[in-house]
């Protein structure tokens, strides 16, 4: 079983999720570690756009995190052969 968990961890590290929101791009691994944050819309860097960039960062992060959780669950089922939700 340890080998399967190790295989799962290695697989999750290699899967990169990309989420975009209003000029903000977040790349996150399927193990929910942020790889990169890119501000594609440089107009967001204006002091008057502070609230817009904060909102876009939050939404992009939440999108990336949700997708990472979804992918991690799928990989867990694939590699370990069971749905972790069934254990609850």
Where are these predicted regions, by residue range?
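Long amphipathic alpha-helical segments used for membrane anchoring, targeting, substrate engagement
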Residues: 1-18, 67-88
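Residue-level signal for functionally critical sites in structured catalytic/ligand-binding pockets
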Residues: 1-9, 30, 49, 55, ...
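Stable alpha-helical structural segments in soluble proteins, enriched in small hydrophobic residues
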Residues: 56, 60-71
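A short interface-forming secondary-structure element
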Residues: 34-53
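N-terminal intrinsically disordered, cationic/polar leader segments
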Residues: 14-36
